[in-house]
């Protein structure tokens, strides 16, 4: 996972490696993918801060990752590989709000899935607010759970429709980070084939480990 790239990879690439782009793109990601293979790794969640160009805004990035046989994923707040931090344009798309703009949110996610379907990915099922905040929702925890449940099932159906495989054959992951863990504990139901990624609290302490039931997933 390339994180906090603002002060490292972004500035180095912008000033030294991809000056003509003024950001990092396929040339930089080719070096990242090569490094992964040298480290015997094959999975990458790309940089996602709004300072850097979103990975999937540059179609050639996907081709580069595929050439190196690197599977692409995304962070806990990027549903279906869509970088909400820099790709969601409020002036054109409205509010990032699943209660009041469900059609708009689902529309951009559906487009992204279709773009990425020919490549190998692990798709993040998620619904958080912009910039690592909670999604606008009711104060009632049951209502929050119902909203997230609806959103995740809609995302799963998009994957099934675009990729043309049963849901259980499409790699998917869910990270109950911050407020999402409380919603998960409210009784959120996830298909058994969805990988749960347990996060820490940003200070190195795990928030949760799998229960005996979850270990059977």
Predicted regions mapped to residue ranges:
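Gly/Pro-rich turn-and-neighbor structural signature
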Residues: 49, 56, 66-67, 93-216
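Feature activates predominantly on carbohydrate-active enzymes
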Residues: 1-99, 117, 174-175, 188-191, ...
């Amino acid at each position: 996972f390339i994180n906090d790239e603002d002060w490292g990879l972004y500035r180095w690439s912008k000033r030294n490696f991809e000056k003509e782009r003024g950001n990092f793109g396929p040339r930089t990601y080719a070096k990242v993918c090569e490094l992964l293979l040298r480290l015997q790794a094959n999975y990458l969640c790309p940089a996602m801060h709004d300072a850097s160009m979103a990975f999937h805004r540059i179609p050639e990035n996907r081709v580069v990752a595929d050439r190196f046989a690197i599977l692409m994923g995304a962070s806990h707040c990027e549903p279906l590989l869509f970088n909400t931090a820099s790709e969601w344009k409020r002036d054109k798309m409205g509010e990032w709000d699943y209660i009041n703009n469900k059609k708009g949110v689902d529309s951009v996610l559906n487009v992204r899935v279709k773009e990425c379907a020919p490549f190998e990915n692990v798709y993040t099922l998620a619904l958080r607010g912009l910039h690592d905040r909670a999604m606008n929702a009711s104060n009632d925890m049951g209502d929050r759970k119902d909203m997230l449940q609806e959103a995740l099932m809609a995302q799963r159906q998009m994957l099934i429709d675009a990729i043309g495989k049963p849901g259980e054959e499409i790699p998917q992951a869910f990270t109950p980070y911050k407020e999402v863990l409380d919603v998960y504990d409210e009784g959120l139901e996830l298909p058994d084939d969805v990988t749960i990624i347990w996060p820490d609290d940003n200070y190195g302490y795990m928030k949760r480990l799998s229960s005996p039931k979850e270990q059977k997933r």
